[in-house]
């Protein structure tokens, strides 16, 4: 569901740093760690386990890298490119989160941690994969199929009224003390993360202005 490619310029990160960055890029906890408004909330553990099982990260070190119209050498500042492939319908909603977490993880490995925020030495591309182009378990898996895979661990809770569907992404969310929720006009909405909540509220506000 999320395939990540990390391209590293010569001398940018040593082998230990590459392994550390790859592990962090492929960790569900890191993906949500940027959102202070989530109140420490993490994706429901059983859904998170399913989500994590779909992560794959590959690291490349190209022998030739040109940036700013010149060939980079080991003496140049580190350059990194991250390509994150996600289901097409999720690309818009996930882009800001993905760009933030990938940049943060790489910046923490640089001697100058402010560099990626001052110069375009780290670029992140979020690429939406067309529906039907993701294959898992020997068959095409569309966005709705992935939503149901993430929701499957909480079907019993939903039947018992202890889980609600996130109105933005459609994933079942168990109602826990730390669940991100919003009460609007007496109706309770639950969200898998703070990002879904914020986007939902923004869409409601926009609809209200219309």
Please place each PLM-identified region on the residue numbering.
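Short cysteine-rich clusters marking metal-coordination/redox-active sites
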Residues: 166-170
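Short linker/helix segments within small regulatory modules
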Residues: 179-188
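Short Cys/His-rich "knuckle" micro-motifs
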Residues: 176-179, 203-204
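N-terminal, Lys/Arg- and Ser/Thr-rich interaction peptides
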Residues: 1-16
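Short metal-binding segments enriched for Cys and/or His
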Residues: 193-210
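Short, flexible, mixed-charge glycine/proline-rich loop motifs
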Residues: 152-163, 183-184
């Amino acid at each position: 569901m999320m395939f990540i490619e990390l391209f590293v310029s010569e001398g940018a990160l040593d082998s230990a740093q590459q392994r550390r960055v790859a592990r962090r890029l492929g960790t569900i906890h890191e993906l949500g760690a940027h959102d202070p408004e989530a109140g420490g909330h993490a994706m429901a553990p059983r859904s998170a386990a399913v989500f994590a099982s779909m992560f794959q990260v590959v690291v490349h070190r190209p022998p030739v890298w040109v940036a700013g119209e010149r060939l980079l050498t080991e003496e140049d500042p580190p350059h990194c490119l991250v390509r994150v492939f996600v289901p097409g319908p999720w690309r818009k909603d996930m882009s800001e989160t993905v760009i933030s977490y990938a940049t943060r993880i790489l910046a923490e490995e640089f001697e100058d941690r402010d560099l990626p925020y001052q110069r375009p030495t780290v670029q992140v591309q979020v690429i939406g994969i067309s529906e039907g182009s993701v294959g898992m378990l020997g068959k095409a898996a569309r966005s709705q199929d992935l939503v149901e895979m993430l929701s499957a661990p909480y079907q019993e809770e939903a039947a018992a009224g202890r889980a609600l569907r996130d109105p933005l992404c459609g994933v079942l969310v168990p109602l826990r003390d730390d669940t991100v929720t919003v009460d609007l006009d007496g109706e309770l909405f639950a969200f898998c993360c703070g990002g879904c909540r914020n986007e939902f509220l923004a869409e409601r506000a926009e609809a209200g202005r219309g």
